[in-house]
Amino acid sequence: MHDLIMSMAEVDISLDIGTKAVRLARAAASSYLRNEKLPDPPADPIFQEKHGVFTTINTYPGNTLRGCIGFPEPYYPLGEGIIRSSIYAATEDPRFEPMKIDEISHVTFEVSILTQPVEITVNPEDRPKAVHIGRDGLIAVYNGASGLLLPQVATEYRMNPEEFLEALCEKAGLWEGCWKYKKVKISKFQATVFGEKDPEGVVEKR
């Protein structure tokens, strides 16, 4: 059977699917931290389609980042990608200590399902005009270094396109204004985002 890789335009991601995605992320991290059998993905066909995906874990209350890891490219079927990214966000984000099981009821889970990244091919000085705040996430790649910012980052910190691009350069460990250079590859993607309002609570589309 051929691999299924579909663009977001071809898939209507409902709140029901988003809720299942977030529940799967929480169940995967919880099971891993308890040394229990990992959950199986839901049976819905979309969980067998390949998508880029990120899992973000935030503290509750407080809403501060606790972990965020994922796959910008559609390497895995969505269900497997959610399971992997959730476990990695909980235990392997180098910015934080690995989560302990007693934290699981004090964090919220958010899942971002990504479209295929597309390179921004305009002249570098025009890149800000190609970035739509609130819709686009960004990826920078140069000489083995890379960085990614999800669309919600720009919204949360009220960035304009130039500020978002500067933050991307910093995230990638590159120099200030790196986005102004053609040798730095900048790509954009969109994400459909679902997250818990509170731990194990109602899931909303963001």
UniProtKB/Swiss-Prot annotation:
Task: List the SUPFAM superfamilies hit by this protein, alphabetically.
Answer: AMMECR1-like
Q: Where is the AMMECR1 domain?
A: 16-205
Superkingdom assignment: Archaea
Q: Which InterPro entries match?
A: AMMECR1, AMMECR1_dom_sf, AMMECR1_domain, AMMECR1_N, AmmeMemoSam_A, Uncharacterised_MJ0810
Tell me the PANTHER family matching this sequence.
Answer: AMME SYNDROME CANDIDATE GENE 1 PROTEIN, AMMECR1 HOMOLOG
The family database entries (NCBIfam families) matched by this protein are listed as: AmmeMemoSam_A, TIGR00296 family protein
**What is the official name of this protein in its record?**
Protein Ta0236
